[in-house]
From Swiss-Prot:
The lineage of its organism: Viruses, Riboviria, Pararnavirae, Artverviricota, Revtraviricetes. Residues 1-38, 100-123 are annotated as: Disordered. Residues 26-38 have a biased composition (Basic and acidic residues). Residues 13-25, 106-115 have a biased composition (Polar residues). This is Putative trans-acting factor. It comes from Avian leukosis virus subgroup A (isolate RSA) (ALV-A RSA).
Length: 123
């Protein structure tokens, strides 16, 4: 095992470096190694969830919209803003009206509950 690590064989380089440091009596994990790991994790998180980037502040976007549609009369502007606000919620509302939560037969913790089985359609 030690020989494999010393030669830098199948095990990754990070591991061998930490093992060598341990042998020489230094700290197991240097700050550089920790930083590298953290940055790598951050990169992975960014790649996995690109949609979690912080959105522009709603007030700012509203002001921008106002600036763009300044010449038009106010009622039209209000109508447009209402449409913009409502659009994202429409799908969610319609599915809620049918009694479908987006957890799909699961409770708030995401655990599944015992779903009833109706033999001949819903009563």
């Amino acid at each position: 095992m030690e020989a494999v690590i010393r030669e830098g064989g199948s095990l990754p380089q990070v591991r061998s470096a930490s093992r060598n440091q341990q042998r020489s009596g230094e700290s197991t994990k240097g700050r550089k190694w920790e930083k590298q790991l953290r940055s790598e994790m951050r990169r992975w998180r960014r790649r996995k969830w690109p949609h979690l980037k912080p959105l522009a502040h709603p007030a700012i976007s509203a002001e921008q919209l106002l600036a763009v549609i300044a010449p038009q009369p106010r009622p039209l502007l209000l109508l447009m803003w209402g449409v913009v606000c409502i659009l994202p919620w429409r799908g969610w509302e319609s599915s809620r009206a049918r009694g479908v939560t987006h957890l799909g037969g699961r409770n708030s913790q995401g655990r599944s509950q015992g779903t009833r089985v109706w033999p001949l359609g819903r009563p």
